[in-house]
């Protein structure tokens, strides 16, 4: 392996969604540098941050059909009973909600938490309040994805925040999806809520850091283990 290949392999790939922003940041840096040279370096720092933001690293995904895997990188900001948003069609009974807050330094690629079929995708316009606030799940712009798994229906909600103003979802209704599959992203700083059945054995607590596609949020069979993994 050449030195160039080694250097290339040591960095996470950049998702194609980021290229327009990276190019725009760099062009603006050049323009600012033409006006006053120190501004170029300020713009270059922002360009490097943009490259980092849109990184899309491979993950080691555990292949256990009884596990619910984190759909987002970030910090677990809420774990507890909550009535899911009405638009998801999951009923009025409480389910377990796990919220993952993604700051501007988190990888913002969202991944499928459990294998199944996409039953519905529901976009809901709204505000752009701080995504860390509990009320963001009710009032902020969001996009809900309902997955019909072998253990029942699970809701995943992408929530825009004060900085994030663009929710992207690549999945479509009736798609068959697998655990760890990329299904969307949110730009720039946001939150992701997941609504799961009450019988799930929780494996995370508030304040814990989660890794999309790897961290086990909960299990339908507390005794189950896995020896199979997928790199993606």
From Swiss-Prot:
The record marks 189-190 as: Cleavage (non-hydrolytic). One of its GO terms (cellular component) is plasma membrane. GO terms for biological process: phosphatidylethanolamine biosynthetic process. Catalyzes the formation of phosphatidylethanolamine (PtdEtn) from phosphatidylserine (PtdSer). One of its GO terms (molecular function) is phosphatidylserine decarboxylase activity. Belongs to the phosphatidylserine decarboxylase family. PSD-A subfamily. Keywords: Cell membrane, Decarboxylase, Lipid biosynthesis, Lipid metabolism, Lyase, Membrane, Phospholipid biosynthesis, Phospholipid metabolism, Pyruvate, Zymogen. It comes from Bartonella henselae (strain ATCC 49882 / DSM 28221 / CCUG 30454 / Houston 1). It catalyses: a 1,2-diacyl-sn-glycero-3-phospho-L-serine + H(+) = a 1,2-diacyl-sn-glycero-3-phosphoethanolamine + CO2. Its EC number is 4.1.1.65. Pathway: Phospholipid metabolism; phosphatidylethanolamine biosynthesis; phosphatidylethanolamine from CDP-diacylglycerol: step 2/2. InterPro entries: PS_Dcarbxylase (IPR003817), PSD-A (IPR033175). Binds 1 pyruvoyl group covalently per subunit. The active site is at residue 190. The gene is psd. It is a peripheral membrane protein. Heterodimer of a large membrane-associated beta subunit and a small pyruvoyl-containing alpha subunit. Pfam families: PS_Dcarbxylase. The modification Pyruvic acid (Ser) is found at residue 190. This is Phosphatidylserine decarboxylase proenzyme.
């Amino acid at each position: 392996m050449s030195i160039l290949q080694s250097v290339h392999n040591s960095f996470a790939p950049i998702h194609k969604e980021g290229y327009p922003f990276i190019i725009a940041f760099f062009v603006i840096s050049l323009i600012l540098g033409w006006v006053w040279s120190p501004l170029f370096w300020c713009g270059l720092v922002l360009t490097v941050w943009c490259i980092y933001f849109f990184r899309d690293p491979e993950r080691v995904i555990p292949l256990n059909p009884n596990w619910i895997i984190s759909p987002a990188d970030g910090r677990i900001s809420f774990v507890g009973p909550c009535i899911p948003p009405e638009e998801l069609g999951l009923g009025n009974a409480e389910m377990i909600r796990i919220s993952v807050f993604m700051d501007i330094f988190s990888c913002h690629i969202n991944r499928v938490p459990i294998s199944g079929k996409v039953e519905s995708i529901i976009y809901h316009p709204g505000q752009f309040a701080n995504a860390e606030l509990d009320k963001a799940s009710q009032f902020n712009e969001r996009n809900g994805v309902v997955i019909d798994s072998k253990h029942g229906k699970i809701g995943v909600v992408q929530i825009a925040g004060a900085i994030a103003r663009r929710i992207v979802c690549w999945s479509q209704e009736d798609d068959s999806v697998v655990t760890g599959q990329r299904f969307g992203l949110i730009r720039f700083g946001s939150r992701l809520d997941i609504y799961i059945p009450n019988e799930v054995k929780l494996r995370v607590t508030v304040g814990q850091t989660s890794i999309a596609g790897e961290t086990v949020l909960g299990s339908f069979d507390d005794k189950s283990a896995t020896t199979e993994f997928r790199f993606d």
